[in-house]
Amino acid sequence: MSVLLIPNRGKDAGLSVTRHTAALLRRQGISVLMPDEFAGDFTSRDGITFLSLDRAVGVAEQVLTIGGDGTLLRAGIFCAEHDRPVLGINLGRTGFLATCEVAELDTKLARLAAGDYTLTTRSLLEAIVPSRNWRAIAMNDVVLFGRTRIHPMDYKLICDGTFVSRYRSDGLIAATPTGSTAYSFSAGGPVLDASAPVMVLTPVCAHSVHAVPVVFGADRHITIVAEQENRDTVYACADSGPQCELAPGESLHITTSPKKLRLITFDPAEQLSAIESKLIRR
């Protein structure tokens, strides 16, 4: 069995947790791989094999991210592309996705080695702006916003070719069930069951008392049009990644991606219990 470690230098000072994790995995008889950019931080005594990220994820059977939810988010799309399950070791604040705490490493890595875990499947969104030849995959959300983010813009929402509503708001968020606990939640959107085959569209600071979040089935094709009334450019981004401009009249198309992300979990009820412990009591 082989595991790829993807650490976040900004979260793991001196890569101490990464080094400890590698030692625990090797003690369980698991081969440890890491991207070759980290080769200079270790010695041959650490027993780690360094490869390019593409080669490493092709060889590894599982991926462990070491950082926080953001670290897992950035690695998640890459892992989904290669159909590799992921476990997040949490060094961040929330740990809603990265559910393994450092204090639990001994126990949970032993369970990982023994195959005592389950895999949960998370849906992804695919966003396309045809007029710009732009395509992105999102694990959390696809967000539309104006240049300054504080001035309202006008959007038209269409589902499967049928007009649904118009929004005048600072932005619009299309979120997966996973992303429903992130930006969409902060904007007043509902928390969705992670296994539900749905997506939610949530307006940000809408200039209407009637503008509410709308939940769509995962098989729907959502089109959002930057209205001609807009005097400025609208921007789209997926999971806070590279942005795409939309001039007035241009459209963003959102569907559920055929690719899925598999998360390693040791408790199938983790997401439900985290609502209380990490969202409400935080």
What do these predicted regions represent?
Residues 1-62, 103-118, 129-136:
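ATP/NTP phosphate-donor binding region
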Residues 152, 162, 166-210:
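Gly/Ser/Thr-rich active-site loops/lids in small-molecule metabolic enzymes
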